[in-house]
């Protein structure tokens, strides 16, 4: 086997490639299902800046769907963007889960000024047949 000849002057990248950019305004998406709550923070163009979920915060199983898990997930996602200088945000809430209000409360407590809160839960215009009711 022939040895690979090292290229001259090919040292690795010295700094990180991405620069931390200031984000004064953003959009916070909360997706609250019965099993989990996912909080995604984007800039106004839709590029993801930070995200967190109840699962990534260490909650497993049925505890992921609790309001406390949603509150922790929202606080983790917001902490990163407050450091980048976010002051104002719009909130889009989707889903029927228990974590809707708890995540919104955690965002309000973070000090970010909310311009508006919008419910974007998809509603069918009598589309697909829903699953049968559970019998426990």
Curated annotation (Swiss-Prot):
A Gene Ontology term for the protein's cellular component: ribonucleoprotein complex
Gene3D superfamilies, A to Z: Ribosomal protein S11
SUPFAM superfamilies: Translational machinery components
Superkingdom of the source species: Eukaryota
Sample GO molecular function, one term: structural constituent of ribosome
Compartment annotation: Plastid, Chloroplast
InterPro entries hit by this protein: Ribosomal_uS11, Ribosomal_uS11_bac-type, Ribosomal_uS11_CS, Ribosomal_uS11_sf
UniProt keyword annotations, A-Z: Chloroplast, Plastid, Ribonucleoprotein, Ribosomal protein, RNA-binding, rRNA-binding
One of the GO biological process terms: translation
Primary localisation category: plastid
Entries under PROSITE patterns matching the protein: RIBOSOMAL_S11
Entry coiled-coil feature ranges: none
HAMAP family (alphabetical): Ribosomal_uS11 (MF_01310)
Family: Belongs to the universal ribosomal protein uS11 family.
NCBIfam families: PRK05309.1, uS11_bact
Subunit details: Part of the 30S ribosomal subunit.
Protein's UniProt name: Small ribosomal subunit protein uS11c
């Amino acid at each position: 086997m022939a040895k690979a000849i090292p290229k001259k002057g090919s040292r690795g990248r010295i700094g990180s490639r991405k620069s931390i950019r200031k984000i004064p305004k953003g959009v916070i998406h909360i997706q609250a299902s019965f099993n989990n709550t996912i909080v995604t923070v984007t800039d106004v163009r839709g590029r993801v800046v930070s995200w967190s979920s109840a699962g990534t915060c260490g909650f497993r199983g049925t505890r992921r769907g609790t309001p406390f898990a949603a509150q922790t997930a929202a606080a983790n996602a917001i902490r990163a963007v407050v450091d980048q200088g976010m002051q104002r945000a719009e909130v889009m809430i989707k889903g029927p889960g228990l974590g809707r209000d708890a995540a919104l409360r955690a965002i309000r407590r973070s000090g970010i000024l909310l311009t508006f809160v919008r419910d974007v839960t998809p509603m069918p215009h009598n589309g697909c047949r829903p699953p049968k009711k559970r019998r426990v």
